[in-house]
Each structure stands twice: as structure tokens, then as C-alpha cells.
Amino acid sequence: MSKIQVNNIEALNNAMDLALERDQNVVLYGQDAGFEGGVFRATKGLQQKYGSERVWDCPIAENSMAGIGVGAAIGGLKPIVEIQFSGFSFPAMFQIFVHAARIRNRSRGVYTAPLVVRMPMGGGIKALEHHSETLEAIYAQIAGLKTVMPSNPYDTKGLFLAAIESPDPVIFFEPKKLYRAFRQEIPSDYYTVPIGEANLISEGSELTIVSYGPTMFDLINLVYSGELKDKGIELIDLRTISPWDKQTVFNSVKKTGRLLVVTEAVKSFTTSAEIITSVTEELFTYLKKAPQRVTGFDIVVPLARGEKYQFEINARVIDAVNQLLK
């Protein structure tokens, strides 16, 4: 199998190219997603290759984009809907939550809505309001949706192609700060990464760290070559937020007895709370110390230069690890 060296944005482009090539029912659209190739150039060259009937531009109307996707999916197509930033998805939530997520149940299985909604998320570009949101917990709690967030090129391509194959809607979050952060060798051919399976990044016996998406790059560097090296840390990349891989996390916590959850999202009512609650409910007697979390703060994302205070977590992670290992 041939290999290619790509960053996350190139892996995503390659995945969409393969999906469009393999299945004539796959269509792609969004604001600037056609001729311009997307604001981050994720769809670069795809309209030129597949034509404007399969790859096209939309006006700034996210509710309409999502509604068109639901109808097209019910009608037999496989739409890829690009919402330019996750913070722009609020108008689309009605169509996604009320129709896309419920159509299988509403029709008693007669209809499904196999669409993929792509959303660049999180910090990294020091932009204005609504450009740096972390909304995965909102989508993850909606029954009928799958919510994924890759952190590297291999998983970006594999999870996206798995999302294309899903008979139900998938919310595909893309960490902007990782789009061009590094390159990785991945297969050039078609492959999938199973939705709902976490990735065990490093094995250890002292502490379990669970994370996903934009924080994984820094955590891997800390564990393999930084201040957290040789501390016995087991690092888990969830990859899928919903349904999340409880078994992998539980098996690790049973071994280490300590848990730290790290996310870029705010602290309250989010995935970090769900993971810690589940572990505490089911594995209380295995815990040597109370689980901790390092997250963003419960505030509106700061603008421009203030962004780093919300999203830079390395020092706080090191402090939390030292506290848990005392």
C-alpha cells in the first residue's frame, strides 16, 4: 500500500476526494466550499474535479445548509455539509437536532439521514467572536448523532471515511490549530477508523490521561519528550466523543487508579464532567485519588490576544499530574 505525507487539512481533502470518487451519491457544499476550496482550503480542487453539481457554494444560511442536507440524505444522497466555523452552527441546530438526529426513530427505521456535518472548531487563529467555539458536548448529548474529533492525519482521514459510511448523521469536528501543525505518513488508499473506538497513545501504570482533539498534540509531546516523560502515564485519545469508548478508559483507570481529563472546552456540563462522573459511578473503589480535569474556563472565548489564556493548558496539566502522583 502506497503512503503519503500529509497534514490534517490535506488528509481531510484526500478523504473527501476518495469519497466523491467512490460514490456518485456523495455531494459537498458550504460557504466558499466550492470555487474557493473552503476558508481553510480543505475542499481545494474538488469542485474543479467533480463539477458544480456535486460540489457547490452556499450563501451564509447555516439553517438552510443543514435542512438541505437532511432532505438530500433522506432522499438517497450522502451530503457533506461544511459549516465554516462551529460557532456558526447555532442556526443549524434545529435542523440537525429535530430532524437529522430523529428521522430514523420518527420513521421507525424506514428513513435515515446519512450526512456528515464538518465543523472547524476551537482556538488557534485568534479570530473574532463565534470563530473559536468548543461545542462538542452540546452535540454529543443528542441521541441519534455521532460526534467525532480526530487529532492527527491518520485518524482524520479514517474517521471521515467511516463517517461517510455511517447510515446516521455524524458531526465531524476539526481542530483548527492542528490543521497544519504537523505531517504524518498515512495510506493513500481508502481505509476507515472505527467510530466509537479510542486510541491508546502510550501505556503506563500510574495515571490515566484522557483527551481528544486540539489538546492531544501538546499532551503527546509532554508525555514522550517533555515534563511528563517517564511518569508512568497512560494517554488515551478518545477520537469519538459520542458514543465514547468507556471500556478503554475504564480498563486504564482500573490499572492506574488515577484519572485526569484534559479538554479545550469549558469546564461545566461538558465531556470532562461526563467522563469523570461515569468513572466515579462505576469504578469508585478502584480510585486512589479523586479524578481531576484541566479545561478551558467557563467564559465566552476571549478575542484575539486573550485566546491563549483560555486554551494554553500545558502548565496546568503538569501541575495536575504532580498533584495526582503525590
UniProtKB/Swiss-Prot annotation:
<dbReference type="GO" id="GO:0007584">
    <property type="term" value="P:response to nutrient"/>
</dbReference>
<dbReference type="InterPro" id="IPR009014">
    <property type="entry name" value="Transketo_C/PFOR_II"/>
</dbReference>
<comment type="function">
    <text>The pyruvate dehydrogenase complex catalyzes the overall conversion of pyruvate to acetyl-CoA and CO(2). It contains multiple copies of three enzymatic components: pyruvate dehydrogenase (E1), dihydrolipoamide acetyltransferase (E2) and lipoamide dehydrogenase (E3).</text>
</comment>
<dbReference type="GO" id="GO:0009083">
    <property type="term" value="P:branched-chain amino acid catabolic process"/>
</dbReference>
<dbReference type="InterPro" id="IPR029061">
    <property type="entry name" value="THDP-binding"/>
</dbReference>
<dbReference type="Pfam" id="PF02779">
    <property type="entry name" value="Transket_pyr"/>
</dbReference>
<keyword id="KW-0560">Oxidoreductase</keyword>
<dbReference type="GO" id="GO:0140032">
    <property type="term" value="F:glycosylation-dependent protein binding"/>
</dbReference>
<dbReference type="Pfam" id="PF02780">
    <property type="entry name" value="Transketolase_C"/>
</dbReference>
<dbReference type="InterPro" id="IPR033248">
    <property type="entry name" value="Transketolase_C"/>
</dbReference>
<dbReference type="InterPro" id="IPR005475">
    <property type="entry name" value="Transketolase-like_Pyr-bd"/>
</dbReference>
<keyword id="KW-0670">Pyruvate</keyword>
<keyword id="KW-0786">Thiamine pyrophosphate</keyword>
<comment type="subunit">
    <text>Heterodimer of an alpha and a beta chain.</text>
</comment>
<protein>
    <recommendedName>
        <fullName>Pyruvate dehydrogenase E1 component subunit beta</fullName>
        <ecNumber>1.2.4.1</ecNumber>
    </recommendedName>
</protein>
<feature type="binding site">
    <location>
        <position position="62"/>
    </location>
    <ligand>
        <name>thiamine diphosphate</name>
    </ligand>
</feature>
<dbReference type="GO" id="GO:0004739">
    <property type="term" value="F:pyruvate dehydrogenase (acetyl-transferring) activity"/>
</dbReference>
